[in-house]
Every structure is written in structure tokens, then in C-alpha cells.
Regions:
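Acidic/histidine-rich catalytic neighborhood of metal-dependent amide-processing enzymes
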Residues: 105, 110-187
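Acidic-enriched catalytic cores of C-N bond-cleaving enzymes acting on peptides and small amides
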Residues: 206-250
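Short glycine/proline-enriched loop/turn "hinge" motifs that connect secondary-structure elements
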Residues: 91, 133, 183-189, 247-252
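Short glycine/serine- and small hydrophobic-enriched flexible loop segments
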Residues: 30, 122-130, 218-224
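Short glycine-enriched loops at secondary-structure junctions
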Residues: 85-90, 96, 176-179, 186-189, ...
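Short, conserved micro-motifs enriched in small and acidic residues
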Residues: 39-42, 106-119, 207-214
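Acidic/His- and Gly-rich active-site-bordering loop/insert found
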Residues: 3-105
Length: 256
């Protein structure tokens, strides 16, 4: 790392990033005003696509699931790296995105996770273009969709499964306001939707028939008794439950 930091091109790129801060902030705040819940990132994706073109990336396009990708070409056959930040936020489309400023501090829903990272991606692309740095391998910039919640990393999973677009030797995700460290080999995750089915019926006249909600409750109770290893740290949670139509109706279906 010390050797890399001494390279003139890297020094020039770092200087450019500092000088580009005002533009980066401007684009950051503009993107904050674009609603982008998971599965509804289209408007923000188009904004990012245009900015990637302006930044000098090649093969800029929006893929089948809505990811925006652009490539900074390398000089040879070196490792191919993806650098990514996700376009979706956790906030519903109707959320008030009014931007507030107190002193030098800006605030609004989604301003951090992960809109700032997308602005940083664009600035990094401009820095490479301005300084002409080219490594041996390609750097693929990706503004990926559906990272949050039930999006379940849909965009980035698609990017890695899309072999027509080539393989990746490394992946860097910008996804935290904390710049004091790097997480190496991040935690994996699995998400499941489990649905319980029954015939349904009236809670009085149909009393005694199998009740999916009761079954789901028993399942949740058993899950809560699971014992997991401390190393590697392993966690679980039943995060959302849905089902039922009325207080006096035996549900025909429920899910967790």
C-alpha cells in the first residue's frame, strides 16, 4: 500500500478527488431527491448511467435487472475488479425526501446508505479518467439494485452470475459512512420466505381445523431455541410475519 501511495498517478488521483468534492456533493444531494426503494430504482439508474458516460467509462449500460455498469479498461490481462455501491434505499417511494441543512450537515432519508457511495463511484471514475491511470485489469463500476431488505442482494447476485459479462477476480463494496477501516471477507447471508397453508374457516364453526398461524407460531418458537456457534459468529431472525384476515377467521395462509 505504501508503495502504491507513492506512485505519481495515485497522488494525482487523490488530489483530483479532493478537488472534485464539491461536484461529488452536488451529485450526492441530487440523487438524494430521487426516490429509489428496492425494485424501483429506474430513475436513479438512468441518472447514474448518464454520469458514468460523462466520466469516460466504456460499455456503460443498464442490465436486465437494473444494475448500471461501466468499465475502466485495463492495459492487459490483469485481475478484473468490480467496485459497487447500491442505488436502492430502505425508504418507501412516498417518503418525504426534503433536504435539510444545519451548518455543514445535510440530512434526509437515504442520504447515507448508500447514496453517498454511488456519488463516490462517479467521482472515482472521473479521477481515473482525469489522471489516465490504467492498471493491467479492468475495473467495472456497478451501481447495483435491490441490495436492501427483500431485495436480497438481487442486483449484485445477478452481476456475478452473468457470465456473458465476464468473471470477476475481486469485489469492493462501498457501503458505510465509516472510512476508518476495511472489512475483508464480509459475512454471508441467506433469506427465506416460508408460507403455511390451510383450508381456512370461521373461528367458531370451524374450530379444530388446522390453523396456519398456530403452526407458524410453533415454528417460530422452535427457531428461537436454535443454538448457533459464536465463532464464526452466526445469527438468525424471523423479521416479518404476515397473514390472517380478521380476528374471527381461521387464516388460510400466513408467512414469515
Amino acid at each position: 500500500m505504501d508503495k502504491l501511495l507513492k506512485y505519481n498517478g495515485v497522488q494525482e488521483a487523490l488530489k483530483f478527488l479532493c478537488e472534485d468534492d464539491e461536484r461529488t456533493l452536488k451529485e450526492h444531494l441530487e440523487m438524494c431527491q430521487i426516490p429509489a426503494p428496492s425494485y424501483e430504482e429506474g430513475e436513479k439508474a438512468e441518472y447514474v448511467r448518464k454520469k458514468m458516460v460523462d466520466a469516460g467509462l466504456s460499455d456503460v449500460h443498464i442490465d436486465e435487472v437494473g444494475n448500471v455498469l461501466g468499465t475502466w479498461k485495463g492495459t492487459g490481462n490483469g485481475p478484473r475488479i468490480m467496485v459497487a455501491g447500491h442505488t436502492d434505499t430502505v425508504f418507501p417511494k412516498e417518503t418525504d425526501l426534503t433536504l435539510k441543512k444545519e451548518g455543514e450537515r445535510y440530512s434526509c432519508p437515504g442520504i447515507g446508505d448508500d447514496t453517498r457511495a454511488v456519488a463516490e463511484l462517479l467521482s472515482l471514475a472521473r479521477a481515473l479518467n482525469a489522471t489516465g491511470i490504467h492498471g493491467e485489469g479492468d475495473i467495472v463500476f456497478c451501481a447495483n439494485v435491490c441490495e436492501e431488505g427483500l431485495g436480497d442482494l438481487r442486483g449484485i447476485k445477478h452481476a456475478f452470475r452473468d457470465m456473458a459479462n465476464g468473471h470477476y477476480d475481486g469485489f469492493v463494496s462501498i457501503d458505510d459512512k465509516n472510512t476508518s477501516g476495511i472489512i475483508y471477507q464480509a459475512v454471508g447471508s441467506e433469506r427465506y420466505l416460508v408460507t403455511f397453508h390451510g383450508t381456512g374457516g370461521h373461528s367458531f364453526t370451524g374450530f379444530g381445523i388446522p390453523n396456519p398461524i398456530h403452526a407458524m407460531g410453533r415454528a417460530i418458537a422452535k427457531i428461537s431455541d436454535f443454538q448457533t456457534p459464536k465463532n464464526p459468529k452466526t445469527t438468525f431472525s424471523v423479521g416479518v410475519i404476515n397473514g390472517g384476515t380478521s380476528v374471527n377467521v381461521i387464516a388460510a395462509e400466513c408467512s414469515m
